[in-house]
Amino acid sequence: MNKKTIAMLGAGSWGTAVAIHLAKIGHKTLLWSHNPQHVALMAEQHSNPAYLPGIPFPENLIPSDNLIECVQSANYVIIAVPSHAFAEIINKIPKPTQGLAWLTKGVDPASHELLSQLVASRFGVDFPIAVISGPSFAKEVARFLPTALTLASNNTNYQKKMHQLFHHDNIRVYLSDDLIGVQLCGAVKNILAIACGISDGLGYGANAKAALITRGLAEMTRLGLSMGARQDTFLGLAGVGDLVLTCTDDQSRNRRFGLLLGREVPIPEAEHQIGQVVEGKHNAAQICAIANKNRVEMPICEQINALLHGIVHAQEAVNNLMSRPAKEE
C-alpha cells in the first residue's frame, strides 16, 4: 500500500509502541506529547526512555508537541491518551479528514459515556471512527512480536483503510462492527485485572484467579448485552483475549497495581510505584455507574470500586464476594 503520514496523539507506552510499529512498516509517524520536555528528550535520545526504554525509534518517527500541526499534516489520526484526557484532545483538534481511530481503553469520567459517544457529539454521528483493541502489551508490539488485534468501526471503507494501515507480518487485525462491545471490554478488563492482582497479592492462588476471570467475563458480557453489544465480541480478542492477558501477566500495570493493594500498600503509594496511569482505577466508578443505570449486577467491579474509595479493605471485599447468596451459573 502507499505509505502515509500518521499522527499518534499520546506518547505513553502504548501510543509509542504502535507509533514504532507504523514507522517500521514505512509510514511517516508523528508522535505527539503535551510535554515539550518529554518531546525534547525523545528527539535527543531517539527513543522514549520515560515510557518505553531501550527501544530505538525508526528515523521516520518524529516527536512533536504541536497538536494542531500534527493533525493537519497527517493522513490518519490515532489517539492514544488516557481516557480522562480523551475529551480534552478531541475538543482541541480540528476535524480529521479521513476519520478518527483510538487505542484508548476506558470511558469518559465526567459523562460516563463511551468514547465513541464523545466523538459523535464532537464530529457527528456519521463521522468514521475505529477502535483498536485486543491482547497486546506495548513492549511486545514495539519489538515486532506476533500480536492479534480487533478493529471495530462504524464505516466499512474507513475500516478497510485502517486495516491496511496496521496489518503486517507481526500484527494480524480482525474486523468488527461492535463498537459498544469492544469499548466495554477494554474498560472493564482493567478493573478485573486489579481484582486478580489483589487476589494474588493476598496469596489466594490459581483457583481464586480463575474464578475472578470467569465471573468477571460474565459481568462484562451482561453489561455489554444490556447496551446492545454482541455476545461473540466478549469471547474474542477484545474480550476474553485481553482479559486473560491483563489479569495474568505482570506486564499489566492494572494487575501490578492490584498486587500492591493486596499486599496492603496504600493506594497513592501503589500508583506512585506503577508510575503510569492505572486505567482500571480511573474507570471503576464510571463502569459501576453505567451498570447501575442499566440495572446490571457487577459484584466484582462493585467491590473493587468500594475498595478504591476506601469503603472496604481487600480481605473484606473478598469476603463480600464469597458470602453472596447462592445462584445458578
From Swiss-Prot:
Signal peptide residue numbers: none
Binding site for sn-glycerol 3-phosphate: 105, 134, 136, 189, 242, 252-254
Record keywords, A-Z: Cytoplasm, Lipid biosynthesis, Lipid metabolism, NAD, NADP, Nucleotide-binding, Oxidoreductase, Phospholipid biosynthesis, Phospholipid metabolism
Catalytic residues identified in the record: 189 (proton acceptor)
Functional summary from the UniProt entry: Catalyzes the reduction of the glycolytic intermediate dihydroxyacetone phosphate (DHAP) to sn-glycerol 3-phosphate (G3P), the key precursor for phospholipid synthesis.
A GO biological-process term: carbohydrate metabolic process
A GO molecular-function descriptor: glycerol-3-phosphate dehydrogenase [NAD(P)+] activity
Gene that encodes it: gpsA
Pathway named in the protein's UniProt entry: Membrane lipid metabolism; glycerophospholipid metabolism
Source species, domain of life: Bacteria
Pfam families, A to Z: NAD_Gly3P_dh_C, NAD_Gly3P_dh_N
Designated name of the protein: Glycerol-3-phosphate dehydrogenase [NAD(P)+]
Enzyme Commission identifier(s): 1.1.1.94
Top-level enzyme category: oxidoreductase
Residues that hold NADPH according to the record: 13-14, 34, 105, 138, 253, 277, 279
Chief location of this protein within or outside the cell: cytoplasm
Family note: Belongs to the NAD-dependent glycerol-3-phosphate dehydrogenase family.
Location(s) in or outside the cell: Cytoplasm
GO cellular component: cytosol
Taxonomic lineage from the root: Bacteria, Pseudomonadati, Pseudomonadota, Gammaproteobacteria, Legionellales
Catalytic activities: sn-glycerol 3-phosphate + NAD(+) = dihydroxyacetone phosphate + NADH + H(+); sn-glycerol 3-phosphate + NADP(+) = dihydroxyacetone phosphate + NADPH + H(+)
Spans traversing the lipid bilayer: none
